[in-house]
């Protein structure tokens, strides 16, 4: 069968590539056409990559407004390409600002729409639920608490676990020995605190300087920034200049594996850190106006996916206008080896793994997609 897949971010590229491997297992004759990145291209062939996510990375109102003509042009290109390819199914991976509109188009063309990794409408832009209900034939969720949320909105989702477990299993299994990793990346023998300041320039700007200030307080530890390749290193160095921090790029899982603890922004990274088993402090600097309006704007009790899945504050969240370095230092020291909160947090992470489920979710989701489309075709033929 023919699969048209759209991912607009690095995480979507990762999960899309694993899903494509699963689709090929379930359907050896699978044909792919996709929007994504290098990892998806490795599986589906670079000749079938329509657009790289680097050309689609517009975040926030200002960036979107400045690039609206480009975005609308890309949507038009995508719709025309879908029509020309005539897929058996369109698979959308998160990225709702773009993908919800593509869902409407594909639905109008009579093409089945499967949304893999549902948009986080439970956190913001809940109005998108109406479009999901109207235009999406099957919604795939990756967080257990979503099993309770979506039925209240009239949508029966499908859950097979979380593909993050597949990504972690693959990367950690292939990671080099700790001594080799330290030598290759210029890291000394001091215990490591990983700094995950975000995957967007705006997040780096909001969080990294504060994180680096912690390094000045704790010279007995080695603070290492987990950078991402699509952000120029200079963007990090603006906020770490003359600060005692080190830098590695595109090696977040490998770095976390050998870290004593981590300071992490909100988002998927909080969950990844916990599933790898590294105690963490969640810090996110927000605008003053947003802090004042947070009680009215935020629809969820926590911002960390760890806490949302456990339904309690297992990791400390400091989501404020100006986080206190003194307070953050105390919290960080409490989760280091010998700290008062470390063992309880590690036990909570064990519980989290049991809730999320083990590896293999990508294959299970893929098998369900193939079976669903095949069943649909059989009904039409008969």
Task: Mark where each language-model region is.
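Nucleotide-activated sugar donor-binding and catalytic core shared by glycosyltransferases
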Residues: 1-382
């Amino acid at each position: 069968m023919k699969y048209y897949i759209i991912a607009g971010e690095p995480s979507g590229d990762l999960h899309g590539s694993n899903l494509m491997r699963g689709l090929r297992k379930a359907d050896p004759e699978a044909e792919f056409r996709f929007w994504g990145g290098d990892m998806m291209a490795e599986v589906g062939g670079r000749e079938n990559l329509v657009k790289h996510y680097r050309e689609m990375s517009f975040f926030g109102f200002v960036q979107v407004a400045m690039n609206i003509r480009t975005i609308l042009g890309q949507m038009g290109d995508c719709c025309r390409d879908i029509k020309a390819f005539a897929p058996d199914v369109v698979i959308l991976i998160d990225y709702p600002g773009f993908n919800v509109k593509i869902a409407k188009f594909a639905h109008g063309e009579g093409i089945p729409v499967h949304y893999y990794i549902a948009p986080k409408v439970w956190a913001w832009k809940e109005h998108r639920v109406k479009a999901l209900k109207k235009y999406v034939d099957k919604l795939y969720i990756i967080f257990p608490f979503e099993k309770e949320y979506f039925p209240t909105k009239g949508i029966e989702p499908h859950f097979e676990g979380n593909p993050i477990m597949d990504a972690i299993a693959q990367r950690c299994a292939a990671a080099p020995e700790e001594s080799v990793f330290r030598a290759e990346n210029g890291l000394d023998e001091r215990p490591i605190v990983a700094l995950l300041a975000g995957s967007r320039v705006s997040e780096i700007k909001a969080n990294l300087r504060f994180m680096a200030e912690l390094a000045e307080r704790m010279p007995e530890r080695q603070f290492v920034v987990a950078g991402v390749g699509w952000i120029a290193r200079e963007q990090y160095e603006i906020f770490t200049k003359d600060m005692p921090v080190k830098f590695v790029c595109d090696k977040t899982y490998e770095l976390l594996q050998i870290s004593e603890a981590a300071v992490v922004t909100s988002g998927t990274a909080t969950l990844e850190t916990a599933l790898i088993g590294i105690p963490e402090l969640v810090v996110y600097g927000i605008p003053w106006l947003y802090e004042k309006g947070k009680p009215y704007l935020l629809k969820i009790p926590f911002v960390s996916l760890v806490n949302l899945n456990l339904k309690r504050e297992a990791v400390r969240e400091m989501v404020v206008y100006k986080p206190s370095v003194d307070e953050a230092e105390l919290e960080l020291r409490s989760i280091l080896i010998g700290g008062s909160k470390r063992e309880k947090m590690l036990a909570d992470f064990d519980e989290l793994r049991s809730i999320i489920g083990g590896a293999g979710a990508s294959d299970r989701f893929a098998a369900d997609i193939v079976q669903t489309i095949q069943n649909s075709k059989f009904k039409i033929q008969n």
